[in-house]
Amino acid sequence: MDIANQLYMKLREEYKIDQKEFISSYICGKTRNVFATILATILSQNSTDKSALIAFSKLNETVGEITPDRIKHADINTIIDAIRVAGLGNSKARYIKNVAEVINDLDLNIEIDCQKLRDFLTAIEGIGDKTADVVLLTCFRCREFPIDTHIRRVISRLGFLGSSPKYKDISEYFKTRFSSEDLLNLHHLLIAHGRKTCKSRKPICDKCVIRDYCKYYLDNIKN
């Protein structure tokens, strides 16, 4: 069993995932609305999922329903005020308005070309690799593996891909080893581990279930 599968097994035993802690999965599962999921994921950029969910709910209350048409016709200052709690309101409001101009409702039930849709999404201002990959994996079960700050920190400390692996290197490593369903589960598990145990400051190494695979722990704590 390679290290990726060992990590997956250990983390599945340790954490129980609550979808409400992961805004993109929660919104896609609740609404079955790809456009709403894209907006929710944009709101989560450089923010916590908790704050992003508050902002999303406020935006939904403000415009009535999150659809491209409602967002297109909403005043940008109204959007800024509604999403303020998620931070970077001016930029995110502009991105949200821009997405509404470009995207009509995407149907979850149609077959899509994942790479073509990824190229389409990442060409839109405000949608980078991570945001696109989150939407593709969460809503369409495309075989993508989004990397956020928690996952990057955990993988960097583990060290099996080097001390500063690039987004593409981490993503490709896991994509070659897991199905889309397992990729989504592992994505959530690694984020949960980064939030609760492998924290940016003062990681709780003595409570870590994967410390025996961790270069940071073996080099700095155990010895």
Curated annotation (Swiss-Prot):
Its cofactor is [4Fe-4S] cluster. Belongs to the Nth/MutY family. Induction: By UV light. This is Endonuclease III. It comes from the Archaea. Changing residue 130 to A: 2% nicking UV-treated DNA. No nicking of UV-treated DNA. Changing residue 148 to A: 18% nicking UV-treated DNA. No nicking of UV-treated DNA. Residues 118-137 form the HhH domain. Keywords: 4Fe-4S, DNA damage, DNA-binding, Endonuclease, Glycosidase, Hydrolase, Iron, Iron-sulfur, Lyase, Metal-binding, Nuclease. Disruption phenotype: No visible growth phenotype, reduced survival after UV treatment. SUPFAM superfamilies: DNA-glycosylase (SSF48150).
